[in-house]
Regions:
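Glycine-aromatic micro-motifs
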Residues: 1-142
């Protein structure tokens, strides 16, 4: 099993059940000294940012689900790359985890419907209201 830190649409339980059917949600976690961004491709990434933190969801993935997620996140195209990090779980315990970051973190606009899914998942997992507000700020005006 690998620990996976999701901070974008993979926080959504139904999406993960479809992509990684044997995944198990551990619970909310935070990635210190990073900030959430939408990259130029229209999807989430994180960037180093001292004193900030990214809220997300920690999952346990068996190797088969990790391979499926690698394919879904299109590592071969170099849009995302997989890195190792250390997150803090809901009990304050620091844990090693992997996550995907955009190879090009240049800021962009979310693809239609993407950020709304991220915000809904953040609310479902009980993230702090100020953080949900920050995520909502990435939703383009209609």
């Amino acid at each position: 099993m690998v620990a996976y830190f999701a901070y974008g649409s993979n926080m959504d339980r139904m999406q993960m059940a479809d992509r990684c059917p044997d995944s198990v949600v551990v619970g909310p976690a935070t990635l210190p000294d990073h900030a959430f961004r939408i990259a130029t491709g229209g999807y989430a990434t994180v960037v180093p940012s001292p004193s900030d933190a990214v809220h997300g969801v920690l999952w346990h993935l068996p190797e088969t689900d990790e391979a499926s997620l690698d394919a879904y996140e299109n590592l071969a195209s170099d849009f995302y790359r997989k890195i190792e990090c250390e997150v803090t779980d809901g009990d304050g315990v620091r844990r090693p985890a992997m996550l995907y970051v955009a190879s090009d973190p240049t800021p962009g606009r979310p693809v239609p419907g993407y950020q709304e899914k991220v915000v809904a998942a953040a609310i479902e997992h009980g993230f702090p209201a100020p953080y949900v507000g920050q995520l909502s700020g990435w939703i383009p005006p209609r």
